[in-house]
């Protein structure tokens, strides 16, 4: 809600309670408050212990399956128009069907969208189980003799960790939807990369770390961008002023970041801050905070939802620079901006959720847009906003790199994540316990 009146007090209370292993905040909510990986682990473990106090008997009986193809199942409540689904769709379509059989299990709503239809078609089998209890879903996976179960939810809304607590598959992985540890002993691996998940973070993860090359985050290189873009005037933006943009959800906007943005507005005459349409309470809180910083609240412009994702991507053309958040970076939203050709400035954080921007920018050959401190972040944004030739050179480099660097090479990513699956599968087939590993570059 962007209500920061008690932020300092709440931060102290939350840290104290989490340290004492009291479940007063969800692990997902904590990521927006706290960058300490040690506290994130404690919170996740406490939450998981409260959610599943007694572990059910494992359904997988230790059998070593000998299928012609490795059977992978992706589980999610978000197989619809959703930030997790957009980047996943192309990967599901590209999976090598000579080596993998790909199943989908959806425990979320059917929104009737084109994205939902596309996702269903991308699976070899698709099971809608929203009304089925957790143990029944787990039994379904065991009956299908799934080799690898991939959770795309973690601790996000509508997650169902109890399915995995039943141990329906010999290999259970956490990927994409939740940038942190589940704190669950029944999850074997978490998929990241060397930037978001260096091996020195292993002590803060209950899962073993899998490092992909380039970037852990998949992106769909076929997403269309509307040819027609609304005008700045239609979007409520100034025709000639500098447009700072951040389309992150409100829970990612912290007071320190917002105050940096207000200082930038104060220094760049005629500039505006373009945000996603938030709930009315968050909008009013941000307007009040702007006034407290001496900024006319009318310089905050809120973008409504668009009819299509292609239209949303197209309107990025109206902005000059995307401003990332901390301690929880833009994830899919950052990918949207870069795919649409909008440069992004990030500040590298202490833990997984705050390092995603750095990972994305490195994978598209723009490490110069990664700041190592908030002071450096502010100075870099100011330079870009006041030096048109510098900004233009960055925009040209982004356009050149967009289709030539790894970030948007979905098939390259597919080869990497399949190599990760096969490595985990081989470890299991040899009767070894899960271990952390790094995937080599695809040929």
Region locations from a protein language model:
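Substrate-binding clefts and catalytic carboxylate motifs of secreted carbohydrate-active enzymes
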Residues: 243-256
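A conserved nucleotide-sugar
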Residues: 99-103, 262-292, 298
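Short hydrophobic "strand-cap" motifs at the C-terminus of beta-strands
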Residues: 75, 247-248, 276, 303
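Active-site donor-sugar recognition loop in glycosyltransferases
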Residues: 325-332, 352-353
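Catalytic cores of eukaryotic secretory-pathway lumenal/extracellular enzymes that build
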Residues: 300-307
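Conserved hydrophobic helix-helix packing surfaces used for dimerization/oligomerization
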Residues: 70-74, 244, 273
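Donor-sugar nucleotide-binding helix/loop cap in glycosyltransferases
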Residues: 323, 337
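Alpha-helical solenoid repeat scaffolds of the TPR/TPR-like class and their adjacent stem/linker regions
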Residues: 1-238, 249, 259, 288-295, ...
């Amino acid at each position: 809600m962007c209500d920061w009146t008690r932020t300092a007090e709440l931060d102290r209370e939350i840290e104290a309670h989490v340290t004492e292993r009291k479940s007063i905040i969800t692990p997902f909510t904590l990521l927006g408050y706290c960058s300490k990986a040690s506290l994130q682990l404690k919170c996740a473990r406490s939450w998981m212990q409260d959610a599943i106090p007694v572990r059910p008997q494992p359904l997988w009986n230790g059998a070593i399956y000998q299928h012609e193809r490795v059977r992978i199942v992706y589980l999610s409540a978000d197989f619809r128009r959703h930030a997790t689904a957009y980047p996943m769709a192309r990967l599901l379509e590209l999976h090598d069907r000579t080596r993998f059989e790909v199943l989908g299990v959806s425990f979320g709503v059917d929104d009737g969208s084109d994205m939902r239809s596309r996702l269903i078609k991308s699976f070899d089998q698709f099971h809608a189980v929203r009304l089925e209890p957790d143990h029944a879903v787990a039994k379904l996976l065991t009956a299908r003799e799934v080799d690898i179960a991939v959770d795309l939810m973690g601790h996000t809304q509508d997650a169902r960790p109890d399915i995995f607590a039943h141990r329906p598959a010999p290999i259970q992985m956490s990927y994409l939807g939740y940038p942190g540890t589940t704190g669950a002993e029944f999850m074997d691996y978490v998929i990241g990369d060397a930037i978001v998940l260096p091996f020195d973070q292993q002590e803060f993860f209950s899962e073993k770390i899998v490092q992909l090359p380039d970037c852990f985050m998949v992106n769909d290189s076929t997403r269309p961008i509307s040819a027609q873009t609304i005008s700045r005037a239609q979007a409520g933006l100034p025709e000639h002023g500098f447009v700072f943009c951040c389309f992150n959800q409100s829970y990612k906007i912290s007071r320190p970041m917002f105050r940096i943005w207000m200082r930038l507005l104060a220094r760049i005459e005629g500039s505006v801050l373009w945000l996603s349409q938030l709930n009315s309470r968050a909008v009013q809180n941000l307007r009040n905070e702007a006034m407290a910083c001496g900024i006319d609240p009318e310089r905050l412009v809120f973008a409504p939802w668009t009819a299509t994702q292609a239209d949303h991507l197209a309107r990025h053309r109206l902005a000059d620079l995307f401003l990332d958040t901390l301690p929880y970076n833009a994830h899919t939203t950052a990918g949207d901006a870069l795919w649409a050709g909008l440069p992004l400035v990030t500040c590298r954080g202490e833990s997984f959720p705050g390092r995603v921007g750095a990972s994305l920018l490195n994978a598209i050959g723009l490490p110069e847009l990664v700041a190592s401190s908030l002071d450096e972040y502010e100075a870099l944004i100011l330079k870009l906003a006041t030096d048109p030739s510098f900004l233009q050179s960055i925009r040209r480099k982004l356009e050149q790199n967009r289709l030539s660097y790894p970030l948007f090479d979905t098939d390259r990513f597919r080869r990497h994540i399949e190599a990760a699956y096969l490595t985990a599968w081989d470890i299991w087939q040899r009767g070894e316990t899960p271990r952390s590993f790094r995937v080599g570059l695809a040929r």
